[in-house]
Amino acid sequence: MKASKHRTLKKVLLNIMAVLCVIVYTGNAIAAANAGEVHKFLKTSPTKIVMKEGAEEEGYKRYFESTYASVEELKAAGNALVREVEGEGIVLLKNAGNTLPLAKGSKVSLVGLTALDPVYGGTGSGAVDASDAPNYVDVLTGAGYELVNQPLLTYYKETDKRTPTDMMEPKWSKIKREAKDENDEMTLGNGEHIVYVIGRVGGEGDDMTKAIEGAWTGEDEDLAPDYLTLNENERDTLMGLAEMKADGDIASITVIINSANPISVGFLNDPEYGVDAALWVGSVGQTGLYAVGDVLTGAINPSGSLPDTWWVDNQLNPVQNNFGSYTYADAAKYNLGNRYDQYVVYQEGIYLGYKYTETRYEDVVLGTPNAGNYVYGNVVGYPFGYGQSYTTFEMSDLTVSKDQKTAKEVIAIASEADKAAAEDRTETVYTVSVKVTNTGSVAGKKAVQVYAQKPYTEYDKQWQIEKAAVELAGYGKTQLLQPGESEVVTVTVPEYFLTSYDALNTGVFVLSEGTHYLTVADNSHEAVNNILNVKGKTTADGMTAAGNAALVHAIEYTFDAETYSKAYGTGEAVTSMFDEADVNRYTGRGDNSVVYYSRSNWEGTVTPGYVKLTMNDQIAADVMLDDADVAAEVGTEAEQTMPTLGKTNGTQLIHMMDYAYDAPEWDTFMDQLTFAELAKICANGLRMTYNIASIGKPQTVDHNGPSGVTQAYSIGDNGYAKVNNDPNMNMKGTCFPCNGIVAATMNDELVYRVGQLIGEDSMWAGYAGLYGTGLNIHRSPYAGRVFEYYSEDGTLTGLIDTVETLGIQEKGVYVYNKHFVLNDQEKNRAGIGTWCNEQALREIYLRAFELPIINADAKCVMTAFNRLGAIWAGSYRELLTDWLRGEAGMSGFAVTDMYDTGYMVKVHEVLAGNDIPDNLVGEDISEFKNYENNPVVVNRLRESSKRVLYTVLHSRGMDGISSNSEVVSVTTWWQLSLNIAQWTTLALAVVFAALLMLDICKEKGLRKCAKKAK
């Protein structure tokens, strides 16, 4: 009986050990597969830097020096800069009767849940820490106002907070009840000023709800069902406040729109709502609310300019007809799933935002046939570039000259080091100068916006080239001008911005025959009116206001398809390469087609409903790339020969610092890497680049985000915070306002400092690369990640990001501009087929990425989840190699977006030019092993690896490494612990199994067996 109990115990222990063995083994395998993330979480490193044997000891090697002495000092600088950026980006939308500024000491009632729950940023991977940020109560109290509705504020404080899909705003009747004090006296409506705060928040993973087919509309009635329109409770509250104002109980109503996404603003000028003043403040970042207080008091005079068109009603935006995710007809026959059978068509072509509203307006004024019934004021609430001031300005003395300038002269904001390194490229530009005078009574700044108009010709109509009435061509900004003070602002406009892409005939950028115009204006609408004035039109012809012909310069051209047949930045031949992204040019389109918007026939092309496409055999085949595509890749003649592998010569990565990318020494250096090392570099990119100890390549930390560093300063071993053992290393980086506010500043010097500060945060956190900035386009106000991106305009996006990228990369941090390209929505972003014609693709969506690459040497991109047509962006060779490395000339490497989709295949990526995956599968190189004897695949693995190595070498990722040191692999404490646990549980399981076997043998009387077991 006793022996039986012992045997039972041994069985139990054996089973326990077996289970533990499996658990520990599985855990070890998972940890090994995701070692990069485990290292970051536990703040360990797979390598360490040691001095070579016999080398003289030296201090910690820094290749990029910080301006700051501590995290505390850096955070203080960041908070001050956030406040400055917000203060200069806030847009004054309305100020009837000079309602603002409100005098300090005024009595104010804060209304709206957002007053206690401000929108600081967005959600998802780009979210940043704003845990210590103030709310509106803190800020207005600190600004010197007397807040008189404390009971209501207490109620707001105790109410559930707003979510990305629910405003949670109470009914007007509830507000009136909660605004009473302990004596049942109303604390609202006692002669005070109302500041009503409206908040909306978006983020990664979902677009905002809208009442259009193809979009998620949610189930909560509070959504109305349009998240970017006032809901019933908000409307009732504003109307109730308006009645109180009409009765003399309220002095004024100011609305603050605390949202990165533009909301429908028809209510602002509807008398029923009684709004006197309105501010757009975006999402405000860590300390941006203090700037809102400064604007309310007049300590800051607002000077922001809208980076988007704001619609009376967002549903009037024709893009909404095709914003969503739609299922191909007949898709069910192919049984593909929603990562393969969804699509969206950019039917608007180039007519996005103001390029639609202003062009249609001009055609109505000009009396163009088929312009249709279009009333500008019924559609546009506030035009692109709009922004009021507490003072007035006059622009005069316009001069324009045609010049030849070098790239160094064009990007004047760059550091001397950047200028010295810049390619000595000469381009034709127009130098536009205008005198700006403050004609008002208070000091202020003024943005100077330059717009271009290209003629819409018969050639354009024949070859389906579309031309907007105006396009932003550049901007500048004055210093703070005192009353009566003047400043001459000069803006450089590349002649390239006067070209149009001719997809169907020449396949190049062309200058059209006829009169082109440059005009200086306050916004896009004023720009059109200026040009219409030159054309002899007046308000009698339907103009909304008289334009100013003195601010217009005319330029004559003959047709030219030669000058810009070479790429703007590199001189490479321009060719039509995106046929497969355009439904009408796609080789497998079958019966599918799309009628794009055209100003040749507005009535016939701007039609309701979305474009309906049908799945066919070719689309189904293209969305399901397989090994046959790899076998069919013949490569260049040079790629037919297997490269040298594993030929060690002792050269370390640090030794290559002085060699150009195409120097022959790099070939010799790359010969050292084995196939496995090349494959590991190209198989591992989860917020890092992989370490190769044999050549002294460290593992880097590459992380989010587009609105500032999202991680703690302690994340990277070679960051200033960790190396200096800073006591505040567990703090997180600076949270900046949304990028729309950054763009609204139109101040290159300020945005450059934003880039420098983000670069500093990255240095202190140990980042070598930054997953940002965000260069997708505000195609629709409802896109979830509008807060990460700058504008509806590709040129403004590219120009603003150029200077921000310069600032970041000056600190040794390479930028991954994202998401490349056409990832302009969140719904079904993983695999959705995005169809867009090549003119729009090049002039809007690629322009945003092109300008930072050409003018700031933006090093890297993150490719998008979506497809261009039927081909995933991360395996589209024409996009990633022919355009990105060829025409645009990007020097660094490309990483995928998060690697959790079935259609992302590593070998397809590398063949296309997408170098590393943002993956979760660790060191597994089995996918590449299948092609170890394929010279094309191996050559492209080598090229991708070289891009990674070259970029990291010239970054702060090499901090701590010198010619006297070497990088060695180490086993960290957690790896050792898991290994010990794995072998211990295995050993114990074997012991208990042996003891159990011994008992069994004894019980059967098999002494020989028992003897052997012993």
What is the meaning of each model-derived region?
Residues 1-502, 512-520, 524, 575-1014:
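Glycoside hydrolase catalytic-domain context in secreted enzymes
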